[in-house]
């Protein structure tokens, strides 16, 4: 989500006594907002409590636990993005990075680019293609252009996103000539 906030709903507790149900509330902080594994750097906002509906007789006693001194890690995983593109029919199944016109579903409207060689469609014919009948080949995500909304490719993945690609009809040109004969045909 492009923040260093680790929401309580994203954190799992381990090492509690078997059968005891605990929950966390509020949020903690990581040292980075980018993809990776981090130590949770600030636990001051996290509160341990008995799980909703638990009672002292069920053994869920939050007062018996502390986060101080434990091991606290948090992983930020890559986010799936969607790509789409269009080109005119050219008799090949090739999809070039330059043919990808939209990369969507990024966080905070971050901008990414495409790079690499070619992907392919299952046919060279005019049609709409999707993840099922395309291959990424060597197409990869690349960092977006420098600026306020530059996205880092390392934070995103094409896996799990949609990949839509359309081959449109090729526009033909025509010309002709004839000797003047006063006819319109």
Question: Where do the model's predicted regions map?
Answer:
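Short loop/turn motifs that initiate or flank beta-strands
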Residues: 2-185
